[in-house]
Amino acid sequence: IANIYDMAMKMGAPVIGLIDCAGLRLQEATDALEAFGSLYFKQAMASGVIPQITAVFGMCGGGLAVVPGLTDFTFMENKEGKLFVNSPNALEGNIDSKCDTASAEYQSRTAGLVDAAGTEEEILGQIRSLICMLPANFEDDASYEECTDDLNRICADLANAAEDTGIALATISDNNIFFETKKEYAKEMVTGFIRLNGMTVGAVANRSKVYDEEGNAESLGCLLYTSPSPPD
């Protein structure tokens, strides 16, 4: 894996890791720990140079759990994906039925480590969509693609999306495509990528409501203040 990072940085190509691993073997002892350290070092050196994406499809525990934390984007499979440094049952009284801290739901909603969760097919599709929006490396200008959408078109329903800015961002984006990151974490804020006139643009916005596919609204009751503290 460390050699793959060397080649990726030399070529200026993204690294995508698909993880389903039971962890290191105790028989390998310090050799395995040294290998983890080497991988962490390569990831740190690649940070900001090439995109790093991790998808957890099965077990990802112990020292390997640090890897998703060092990558730029992390995805998890809903049912089989498990992400933990210490096994959840290492905590007294912590059972899966009470709080599965290794699950995709917990890691995306509470820990905020996971950008998106879903089935294997959904995750692979999301990775493809994300890769299309990102440059291959920090020197690449390939985050631009030919645009067939009119930048000056009228967004007739934009006012109706004022409360849920995720919808507003999709409305103004080329072909109404918005890739949202950390979708389940801190829903009062929206972050992600859109395209404007073919160019990838990072987006951040606050919102007060979240609308589902059926139009039902979840009120968040949050406001964004520009001053250090809320007014009296």
Explain the meaning of each model-derived region:
Residues 8-12, 32-33, 154-163:
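Short low-complexity stretches enriched in small and charged residues
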Residues 1-26, 193-207, 212-216, 227:
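A structural preference for short, pocket-lining loop segments at secondary-structure junctions
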Residues 110, 121-223:
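Intrinsically disordered, low-complexity segments enriched in small/flexible residues
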Residues 1-3, 59, 188:
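Short alpha-helical segments and helix-capping/turn motifs at coil-helix boundaries
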Residues 19-139:
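Conserved catalytic cores of soluble enzyme domains
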Residues 13-14, 40, 51, 187-191, ...:
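Short glycine-rich loop/turn motifs
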Residues 225-232:
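Conserved small/polar residues in nucleotide/adenosyl-binding loops
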